[in-house]
Amino acid sequence: MKKFKPIIRCVIFLAGLAAIMGVIDFACVQTGYVNYILRNVCAKDNGTDYDTVVIGASHARASSDPEQIDKNAGTYSINMAIPGETVKDSYYVLEETCRTNDIKTVILDIDYQYYFNPPKEGFYTEQFIQCQMDWRSYVKWQYIYDNMERMEIRNVFTRRQACTFTPSNMKDNIEQKLSKGYKEADIYSLDVDGGTYAGRGYFYIKPVSGELAG
């Protein structure tokens, strides 16, 4: 029995640490579009099976309307472009989309900015998409392994960039994660400045008026 005591203590310590991290994650880590769209594309209880996917960053999210694509191409598409998404992110977002959908066509948004000044790998915010993937997804674990080769291990598993510890923000986080909109990954429930979500990942930017309109 003495031989197993150190092991038992380690297990208890790790379990306690996981519980503490779970509470912090629930109360302090903000969530939003990335979490919702990843859950939407993987949901199978709504009878959807996309055959076309748009991959890119913010420009693609606001310029590629799945409804218009389907109308002209006879497809059933989803826009998985995510603001801040890198080329490496696109690879894993595509793999995650293919995990639960029979994708036949990929529309890849090519913007010179993606390649002209690509971000250096290893920065602590790099895993902002990886951290929002489902723990049951093998793609998430592939992504974790990839990031561990370049990042400090604590940054791989924690969402430092999304943490907030002010009482008001923690209250908002908890209310959001207990809401029906969050549980159902309802993108339309998100309040976003500058535009509205118009369906299947497409973000409609409101027309600019006044001096900024040019």
Can you say where each PLM-predicted feature lies in the sequence?
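Hydrophobic membrane-insertion alpha-helices, especially the h-region
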Residues: 5-26
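Membrane-embedded segments
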Residues: 55, 59-146
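Secreted/periplasmic serine-hydrolase-like ester/acetyl group-modifying domain
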Residues: 125-214
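Acidic/glycine-enriched edge-of-secondary-structure segments
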Residues: 21-31, 76-84, 203-213
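Short amphipathic alpha-helical segments, especially helix-boundary/capping motifs
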Residues: 15-17, 40-45, 66-71
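N-terminal hydrophobic targeting signals that begin at the initiator methionine
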Residues: 1-2
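Alpha-helical transmembrane signal-anchor/signal-peptide segments
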Residues: 28-49
